[in-house]
Amino acid sequence: MAVDMHSFAKPEDVVVNHLSLDLNVDFKLQKISGSAILKLNRVSNASVVFLDTKALKIFKVTDSKGTPLKFELEKEVPFLGQALKISLQPNTREIIVIYETTAGSSALQWLSPAQTLGGKHGFLFTQGQAILSRTWIPLQDSPGIRFTWDAKIHVPTEMMAVMSGTNPTAKNAKGDYSFKMNKAVPAYLIALAVGDLEFKELGPRTGVYAEPSMLGKAVYEFGDLENMLSSAEALYGKYLWDRYDVIVLPPSFPFGGMENPMLTFATPTIIAGDRSLTSLVAHELAHSWSGNLVTNKTWDDFWLNEGFTVYFERRIMESLYGKDYAAMLAVLGYQDLIETIADLGDTSEDTHLKLKLEGRDPDDGMNDIAYEKGCLLLLQIEKMKGREAFDQFINNYFNYFAFSSITTEDFLSYIEKELQLTAEEIKVLKRWIYAPGIPKDLPAPQSSLFIAVNNTLTKFVSGNLTANELNVQSWSTHEWLQFIRSIPDNISLTNLKDLDDTFKFTNSENSEIRFAWLMKSIPAGYLNADISLDEFLSRVGRRKFVLPLFKMMLKVPRLETHASELYTKTRDGYHAVTVQSLDELFNKK
């Protein structure tokens, strides 16, 4: 049995199979307080249960009749927090924990009215993955342990609460909201957001939540959501979570998206105005199968969540927009992977698909290895066995393991039987999973559209065409990203200015384009972008953008001191997930 080194829980003795929350959200004191009722399955005759907690105040623990139970918070362990050890009576099947969060509850980000679009009310959201749910709920915080849950959440009357379960579509005059999730999920998939929110339906099963002034833009941007859902079902079977809604969060949200069941949490940086960045939503939707339905049992197996999801996301995009479109995504993803491998070192164990994260924060494994190397492995299997056979395998895989958590080794033994792999094929798979880097002879993905982009760039750099003369009117975001990423490092400032004057990259509303431009133009000495860089880092907290930009600043002599000063100013506006990565960066310096 796989042991989760990132949880104090002992599921071989006691397993939580249902959680009931009754919580009050206090914006003035910036804390959540109330009770968690946990129903227990007593697997062995052990007389204690261990829950995961971090930065929680525990006031009292009782059984279902209100009889106090003896408890203690054990010694704190870095990253993991403290085990809450509770003594059980022989007939205890339910425990009630009375508790509150603290300033150290790093899943929570409390935003002031000034950090929201509306500017009138605060905002709260949670981010549980990987092991932060324990900072706002005492529970068994392991991806290998699944349970159903329900919740009563009490919030200020001018706000709406939404969760990763059944959701309201309008504000409640009393500020009292009830939720339930009747399918067993791991702890990291419990999420809460509270703010001045409105809802708009997009289709029979889809809708969007956002602050009122963002709602119209979000409705347009996610107009293809119902089609995406149908495409996903056509590929890999029925959607089993009833509704699929998206909430657009304030810009400090640390990720592009988070696949909370029934309600994807999304960054506003994907609102580009032209639906060009919605592959991120296809990714989170795909997680409704890979990750939420079939989950990595430990964080060492994270690639099972993400490799499958990237593969599935690109298949959705291919079915909606064609092979050329999906090929562009594959090339950009491959570029990110090569950069990550170079960063980690091509012999590093961190470039294995199966990780060894014991004694480390599992967040360390959340990079492009799991996503892009994982996807490349699945593409290799597709090539080996043919798309039709591989699609059938994936359908069977999701059905067979539905609502369970599995290890890499479970995957290997299942695929070996299902696809009747030869000894040589198994060897190839194991090399991908347990060896570093990617095979040297692996051909890089190609995109015919990007070849045309590269030709256009060559004409510009060689001086044959000015920026104004480039034939780019029909380009997608992905073509622009290829163009900007491929600009040579020794490009002249005159050329950079010509591009910027023509295409307004420095202040682009498209966050991916603006990020790529800042990463390219600032090291080249293009001073006009410096103000835009400061503004972007002061407003956006998405780690994918913020961490590389600060890393880049520290390598540019004129900005090295400024980077530290700017981080001191912006740090309080970022979520703890982003702060942790940046603190490491600046402490290493």
Stretches with model-predicted labels:
Residues 1-242, 366-368, 385:
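Acidic/His-enriched low-complexity segments
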Residues 44-45, 65-68, 90-92, 169-176, ...:
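Short, glycine- and charge-enriched coil/turn segments that flank and shape catalytic ligand pockets
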Residues 47, 67, 91, 173-174, ...:
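Generic alpha-helical secondary structure signal
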Residues 56, 184, 270-271, 522:
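Hydrophobic pocket-lining residues within nucleotide cofactor-binding pockets
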Residues 58, 80, 179, 208-463:
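Hydrophobic alpha-helical and helix-loop surface patches within well-folded domains
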Residues 108, 162, 255-257, 528:
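Generic domain-boundary/flexible-linker signal
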Residues 367-368, 373-374, 398, 402-407, ...:
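Long, ordered, helix-rich scaffold segments
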